[in-house]
């Protein structure tokens, strides 16, 4: 943490704004992004505009600001949040000189949205608080940049990778196997981590960057990402980058990526059973963890539970089914929302509909386990609530958000 400190008066003013942030936080952050992109359009090359339109990015930022204000007396309490965001920043190649731009526009947004409630004293207190928090991020990210670049096979910023193989996994999911274009060493990674892919799409003014989980075990001589083609739904447009990768990136093409990042990683120590619960393309980081355990010959009980619309959309089923058939310590169960007649013949399909508490209870004979889950947010909220009701200790519960971090608290 930074050695800088805030005066007691500044802390009191910041804490006094907590109710205001609870009420107006998203309005402030939406205005902030609009203002910042207007004054600094070059930052559109970094931020995911789909998440902006969905409101997920402003909501995530509002939650972070609220948490910082609430814990201004003890910023150590939000270090896990800082670490998670810093991993994302390092992956996106965020630079220290961009923090003052964010601070300037955030304070201006507070003033313009809150009006008289944003007095000079309030804005000055938040300026001091922001500078302290920004310094924490800059120091944490500096260390992350150094670790990524100094690791064997590591690098800083972006590196060119060739698509060695492109493999269809389901109706909407495809894997890309990537190797360094320069033929040099490839950095290892922790199972569960992700990389950022940067693409320049013809006809688009700005570059696009997206994070994709590495979906295979490390030390295989390649990185594998497994990408769902986002088709769009209602007001949500089709995914710009996912459709570009599916339709226009082929074997032999080159992608620019950053070194692996992320703190959703496999904790290999211990003897408890490991339970993986995935929904849709949320299977990808869990497959990296699962394959790592299999590669290392771990004897702990491993239970893999996956939910999909049906077999048509289910990626990597054959691999999981074969492994479960061959390994006594591996158990595999599938839940299909709308199974086909063929799906009903699948011996691993155990439920039709959605994963619920009774289904998990029927599969898991021992709740004293380490749980890892990833998938759509409503799916994750369901799993989180079940584990909370079961009194599973927090240190045994691990999950990953795709996109801006949110909250799994029941609404």
From Swiss-Prot:
Q: How is the cofactor bound?
A: Binds 1 heme b (iron(II)-protoporphyrin IX) group per subunit. Binds 1 FAD per subunit.
Top-rank EC class of the record's enzyme: oxidoreductase
According to the UniProt record, where is the region Reductase? 153-411
In this chain, the site described as Influences the redox potential of the prosthetic heme and FAD groups is at 88, 400
Q: Which InterPro entries match?
A: Cbr1-like_FAD-bd_dom, FAD-bd_FR_type, Flavoprot_Pyr_Nucl_cyt_Rdtase, FNR_nucleotide-bd, Globin, Globin-like_sf, Globin/Proto, Hmp
Q: Where does heme b bind?
A: 89
- Domain (FAD-binding FR-type) spans 156-267
- Which biological process terms from the Gene Ontology are attached to this UniProt entry? cellular response to nitrosative stress; nitric oxide catabolic process; response to toxic substance
The entry lists its GO molecular-function terms as: FAD binding; heme binding; metal ion binding; nitric oxide dioxygenase NAD(P)H activity; oxygen binding; oxygen carrier activity
Q: Which HAMAP family match?
A: Hmp
Q: Hey, which family's this protein in?
A: Belongs to the globin family. Two-domain flavohemoproteins subfamily. In the C-terminal section; belongs to the flavoprotein pyridine nucleotide cytochrome reductase family.
* Protein's UniProt name: Flavohemoprotein
Which organism's genome codes for this protein?
A: Halalkalibacterium halodurans (strain ATCC BAA-125 / DSM 18197 / FERM 7344 / JCM 9153 / C-125) (Bacillus halodurans)
């Amino acid at each position: 943490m930074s050695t800088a400190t805030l005066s007691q008066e500044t802390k009191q003013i910041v804490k006094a704004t907590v109710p205001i942030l609870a009420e107006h936080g998203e309005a402030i952050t939406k205005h902030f992004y609009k203002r910042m992109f207007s004054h600094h359009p070059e930052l559109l090359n970094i931020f995911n505009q789909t998440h902006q339109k969905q409101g997920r990015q402003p909501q995530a930022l509002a939650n972070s600001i609220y948490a910082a204000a609430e814990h201004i007396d003890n910023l150590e309490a939000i270090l896990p949040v800082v670490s998670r965001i810093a991993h994302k920043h390092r992956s996106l190649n965020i630079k220290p000189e961009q923090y003052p731009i964010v601070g300037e526009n955030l304070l201006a947004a507070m003033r313009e949205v809150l009006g008289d409630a944003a007095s000079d004293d309030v804005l000055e207190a938040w300026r001091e608080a922001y500078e302290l928090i920004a310094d924490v991020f800059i120091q944490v990210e500096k260390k992350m940049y150094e670790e990524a670049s100094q690791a064997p096979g590591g690098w800083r910023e972006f590196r060119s990778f060739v698509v060695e193989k492109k493999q269809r996994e389901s109706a909407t999911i495809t894997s890309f196997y990537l190797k360094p274009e320069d033929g040099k060493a490839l950095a290892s990674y922790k199972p569960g981590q992700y990389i950022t892919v940067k693409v320049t799409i013809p006809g688009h003014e700005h570059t696009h960057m997206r994070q994709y989980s590495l979906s295979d075990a490390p030390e295989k001589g390649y990185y594998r990402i497994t990408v769902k083609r986002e088709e769009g739904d209602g007001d949500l447009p089709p995914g710009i980058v996912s459709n570009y990768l599916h339709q226009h990136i082929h074997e032999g093409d080159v992608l620019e990526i950053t070194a692996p990042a992320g703190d959703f990683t496999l904790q290999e120590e211990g003897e408890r059973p490991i339970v993986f619960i995935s929904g849709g393309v949320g299977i990808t980081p869990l497959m990296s963890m699962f394959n790592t355990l299999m590669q290392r010959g771990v004897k702990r009980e491993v239970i893999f539970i996956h939910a999909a619309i049906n077999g048509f959309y289910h990626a990597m089923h054959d691999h999981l089914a074969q492994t479960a058939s061959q390994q006594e310590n591996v158990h595999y169960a599938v839940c299909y929302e709308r199974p086909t007649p063929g799906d009903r013949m699948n011996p691993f399909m155990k439920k039709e509909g959605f994963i619920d508490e009774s289904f998990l209870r029927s599969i898991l004979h021992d709740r004293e386990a380490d749980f890892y889950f990833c998938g759509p947010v409503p799916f994750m909220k369901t799993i989180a609530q079940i584990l909370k009701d079961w009194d599973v200790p927090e240190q045994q519960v691990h999950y990953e958000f795709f996109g801006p971090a949110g909250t799994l608290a029941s609404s």
